[in-house]
Amino acid sequence: MKVVVGMSGGVDSSVTALLLKQQGYEVTGLFMKNWEDDDDDEYCSTRQDLVDVASVCDVIGIDLEVVNFSAEYKDRVFADFLREYEAGRTPNPDILCNSEIKFRCFLDHAMQLGAERIATGHYAQVREWINDGRSEFQLLKAEDGTKDQSYFLYRLNQAQLAKTLFPLGGLYKREVRKIAEAAGLHVATKKDSTGICFIGERPFREFLMRYLPTKPGEIRCLDDDRVLGEHQGLMYHTIGQRKGLHIGGIKGNQDEAGEHEAWYVAKKDVKANVLYVVQGHDHPALLKDRLLATDLNWIAGRDPRTHWVYTAKPRYRTADMPCEIDALGEGRAEIAFATPQWALTPGQSVVVYESKVCLGGGVIV
C-alpha cells in the first residue's frame, strides 16, 4: 500500500515515515510550503525544515515530493484568520489549516500521486468500527495525554479519516525521540515547533500589525464604566488576558491579603471599540456555565444525543469538563457545563468527547 507522509522537518513526522517504512508500506515523503510572505525573515524556518526533511528521507530511503499550497493557505485559512480578528474574536487557524490544507489539499494531492492513504505526525488515533451494520471511523485521543492533538482535528470528516493513518497515536513523545535516535535521525533532539504555523516564534502583535492597522479605543471597567486607559486595537487582546494592558498601576479591589487584584479582559464591544476589564481572576464576568457554539462539525455525521453527559474542552490544554449538549439546528448548539468555566473566548473552538472518542465541536460565539 502506498502512503504519502506529510513531513515538516520535525521528529514526529520523521518517525511517522520511518515506522511506516519499517512496517512494509511504500512510503513517499511530502513537504508542504504553506507560507511565502516571510521567506527572508529571521523567524522563517522553512529552508532549514526542508533541508531536515531531505536528510531524513535520504536516511530512511524514501522519495521526497515538495508542493506549494501558499495560495490555498492564504485563501482558505489566513483570510479567515484576519476576518475573525477584525471582528473582535480570537480564532485558532491551526484547526482550519488541518481541515482545509493538511487533510484536503494534501490529501487530494497524495491521491493524485497514487497513494491509498496519507499519514501525519499528529498525536491522535483512528478506529474503524461497525455501527448498525455500516463501517464508521472514529477519532480517538492519543495514548500520550500530554501531547494529544485530537482537539485540533475535530473538523475532520468520515472521508478524511478513512484515508488517514496516525502511527504515533499509541506512543509517548519520549518513545518517539528514542526511535529517532536509534535510527540515526539527526532530528531526534530537534525542538518542537510552537505557536501558529505561519507566525512561528515572532511576537504576535508585531505580526498582526503588518496586516491590521492599529485602532485605538478606550479601556473601561466593566463594573463602574470608568475609563482606565487606552488600547491600540481590540484584535490585540483576548478574553482572560492579564498582561499587556498597561493599567496595572490603577488600584481598585483588594484580595484577602490586602493586595490589589490584577485586571483581566472580560468583554469586547466591537461597535464602540471599547475593551472592558475586571479585577480579580475569579470575577463573575469571567465565569460562565454555558456557551453557544456555531459552525459545528460532528465527525460521525450526526448530532450527539441530547441530555446525555459528555465532556468538552473549551480551549486546548484544559481538562475535559462534564457537559450536556442541546442541538439547536442550523449548525448551532448550546453546551451547558456542570461547573462554571473561566474565560470562554469567542472564536476559539469547543471540542466534545465521549470518553476517548472525539465527537466533534464548533466555534464559540
Curated annotation (Swiss-Prot):
This enzyme's EC code(s): 2.8.1.13
Annotated residues for binding of ATP: G6, M7, S8, G9, G10, V11, D12, S13, M32, G121
First-listed, main subcellular location of the protein, grouped into a coarse class: cytoplasm
Positions of region (Interaction with tRNA): 147-149, 315-316
* Keyword Disulfide bond tagged: yes
Where in or outside the cell it occurs: the entry states: Cytoplasm
- Which residues lie within the region annotated Interaction with target base in tRNA? 92-94
**Catalysed reaction(s)?**
S-sulfanyl-L-cysteinyl-[protein] + uridine(34) in tRNA + AH2 + ATP = 2-thiouridine(34) in tRNA + L-cysteinyl-[protein] + A + AMP + diphosphate + H(+)
Q: What GO biological process term is on the record, naming one?
A: tRNA wobble position uridine thiolation
Single GO cellular component term: cytoplasm
Annotated active site residues, numbered on this chain, are C97, C197
Q: Tell me the InterPro entries matching this sequence.
A: MnmA-like, MnmA-like_C, MnmA-like_central, MnmA-like_central_sf, Rossmann-like_a/b/a_fold
Q: Where is this site: Interaction with tRNA?
A: H122, Q348
Which residue pairs form cystines in this protein? C97-C197
Per its record, what are the GO molecular function terms? ATP binding; tRNA binding; tRNA-uridine 2-sulfurtransferase activity
On whether Transcription is a keyword of this UniProt record, the answer is no
Q: How would you classify this enzyme at the top EC level? A: transferase
Domain of life of the native organism: Bacteria
UniProt keywords, alphabetically: ATP-binding, Cytoplasm, Disulfide bond, Nucleotide-binding, RNA-binding, Transferase, tRNA processing, tRNA-binding
NCBIfam families recorded for this chain?
PRK00143.1 (NF001138), trmU (TIGR00420)
Q: What protein family does this chain belong to? A: Belongs to the MnmA/TRMU family.
The record describes the protein's role as:
Catalyzes the 2-thiolation of uridine at the wobble position (U34) of tRNA, leading to the formation of s(2)U34.
Name under which the protein is recorded: tRNA-specific 2-thiouridylase MnmA
